[in-house]
Amino acid sequence: MAKPQVTILATGGTIAGSGESSVKSSYSAGAVTVDKLLAAVPAINDLATIKGEQISSIGSQEMTGKVWLKLAKRVNELLAQKETEAVIITHGTDTMEETAFFLNLTVKSQKPVVLVGAMRSGSSMSADGPMNLYNAVNVAINKASTNKGVVIVMNDEIHAAREATKLNTTAVNAFASPNTGKIGTVYYGKVEYFTQSVRPHTLASEFDISKIEELPRVDILYAHPDDTDVLVNAALQAGAKGIIHAGMGNGNPFPLTQNALEKAAKSGVVVARSSRVGSGSTTQEAEVDDKKLGFVATESLNPQKARVLLMLALTKTSDREAIQKIFSTY
C-alpha cells in the first residue's frame, strides 16, 4: 500500500533554531534548513512520503502579511494536487496562532493542514520539536483530520486554529484554547479527536486571497488607565484602515480614547473592540453602545486574531454592520 504524500512547508522559528549550548536558552531562530529539520526525525519517513519546501527562514516575530499570502497561496496550490494528501507548516510559536487562523480562513480544501513548532531549539538538551513534528505528521495523515479546519499540534495536543493561543512564554505546554479546550490529543502518534471547531473555515469561508497582493493595514491599540488619543491619532496618520482596540474588561476604552475612536469610526476607519483579558467574549451593547458609536464587537476573538479577521473583512467591505456580521460568523 502506497504511503500518503505530505508536503512540509518550513517558515523558520524555534523548531528550526540552533544554539551553541544544549543547556542555555540562547539560540538563532530559523537557522536550520527544512532538509536538515526533516533529517532529524527519520521516523516520519515510515509514515508518509515527505517533501519539504522552504517558504522563509525567520523568527515568527518577523511574520508579515506578505508571507501569509505567499503561504496560503502555496498551500492552496499543493492541496489542489491529487497526490498531496496534507500540508504541514513548521512555524515559530510567537505568531503561530495568527498564521493558523489566517490559513483557516483562506485555505480552500478539506485536506488536513497542520501547524507545528517548538518551545526549545533543536540544540537543546530536551528539544520538543522532533516529537511535535512526528505527532504532526501522524495528525496530518489521519483520516479523522479531514475537514477539521487548520489545526495546531503542540505538546501532544491538537488545537483548532480559531481557538488556540500561546499562554506561556517559555513552557513546552505553551498553547491552550481558553474558551473551548483542545479538540484532540496525539500521543506517540496515536490520534484521538474529542470535538471540532463549529465556526466556518476553509471551504465554508467567504475569503478569497488568490488575487490579493497586499492586505489592508490594521493596528492594535492596548488600553490602560490614563490612556489618551495619541495612539489612535498615530494609527490614523499611518494610514490604518482598521483599528483593533484591546480594551479593559469587556473591551472598554478609557473615555478620552473612546472619543478618539468614535471620531475614527465616523471618518470611515473600522474600529473593532476586543479585550486584553485572556478569555471570554467582547459582547455587543454592554457598557459601550457599539451601534451608536459605530464600533464592531469582536466577540470571542483575542486582539491578534481579531486583527487577522478584520484585515480579511476589509478586502470585501468597510460597512460596519457587514463586518459585525463577519465577526459574529467566524
From Swiss-Prot:
Main location group: cytoplasm
Entry's EC annotation: 3.5.1.1
Domain of life: Bacteria
Keyword Hydrolase: yes
Xref: SUPFAM superfamilies: Glutaminase/Asparaginase
UniProt xrefs under InterPro entries: AsnASE_II, Asp/glu_Ase-like_sf, Asparaginase/glutaminase-like, Asparaginase/glutaminase_AS1, Asparaginase/glutaminase_AS2, Asparaginase_C, L-asparaginase_C, L-asparaginase_N
Catalytic residues in the record: 14
Catalytic activity reported: L-asparagine + H2O = L-aspartate + NH4(+)
PROSITE patterns: ASN_GLN_ASE_1, ASN_GLN_ASE_2, ASN_GLN_ASE_3
Any one GO cellular component localisation term in the record: cytoplasm
Protein location: Cytoplasm
Keyword entries, A-Z: Cytoplasm, Hydrolase
Subunit description: Homotetramer.
Family: Belongs to the asparaginase 1 family.
Protein name per Swiss-Prot or TrEMBL: L-asparaginase
Species whose genome carries this gene: Wolinella succinogenes (strain ATCC 29543 / DSM 1740 / CCUG 13145 / JCM 31913 / LMG 7466 / NCTC 11488 / FDC 602W) (Vibrio succinogenes)
